[in-house]
């Protein structure tokens, strides 16, 4: 009931709070015999970590991960892998002035209603700080998927506010602090971020995540559809308010003659479905987009109430991201990797002996 785990065969359980001593997770279901080191996980953690650029939160965490178990002599043993990241740059005093206030748009009010109390320091368990462990676990899945099955997962910032990326150059994504695939938009993004910092406000974003090399057959009927599990995983990311698979909400304006992905002897002629048909992967690239709200931790005064129900005004003075969509890029990759890893192992467990003569491309 606690909601701290995801996956069935490849299962990840996280723990920790924003201003607690440490963050950690247990990863079950990792196949034995895969070479694994802390360096394999650190690359994606460095992409996500706070303070990595002037466009993200000023909180500076090294996010150095430690592997506590499940790896012997540099190789996975098949047993539970324990991971730990210590928090080192907490400034809980930044939140002392608002400990009895509810930040509008945050989980403060709903957590208080659910538990009767809350950790007001940076949001506690509801903070996006928790996603560091998802990225660490996702790095394990990404390595296995790529090495064993040739599956490559990548994401990018496809929109920030009114700035929309028109060109998708994946080589460009890792060359700028926005994870933006369109070099022509970098100047506009920089100007927007400087304006947001100047006025103490924030902005929403869209992140696109894609997986190539996904084999057909992943996913189960009805409640365990691949797209259902993927949407669940992506919606669990902090600040995500919407998820699209394939053409998503654009299908409302399409006709069946346009939307259906016709098939030829050489393969599919389009990919409006985003690589999933009937909840099961088709072998085409998996494509999803997620919409992230603007963070509510801003310097602009807003109305709220105290725990006693009295009206008051609030200003959040902590260190926060003007656009959470930037650091959501490696998180989206991690969540897609966790879902694909779990479904791949489930498919192997049930259908490893299935032989299909229908062409695949």
From Swiss-Prot:
Gene Ontology terms, MF aspect: chorismate synthase activity; FMN binding
Cofactor: FMNH2
Pathway terms, separated by semicolons: Metabolic intermediate biosynthesis; chorismate biosynthesis; chorismate from D-erythrose 4-phosphate and phosphoenolpyruvate: step 7/7
SUPFAM superfamilies xref list: Chorismate synthase, AroC
Subunit structure: Homotetramer.
The protein's role, per its UniProt record: This reaction introduces a second double bond into the aromatic ring system.
Protein name per Swiss-Prot or TrEMBL: Chorismate synthase
Organism: Edwardsiella ictaluri (strain 93-146)
Protein's gene: aroC
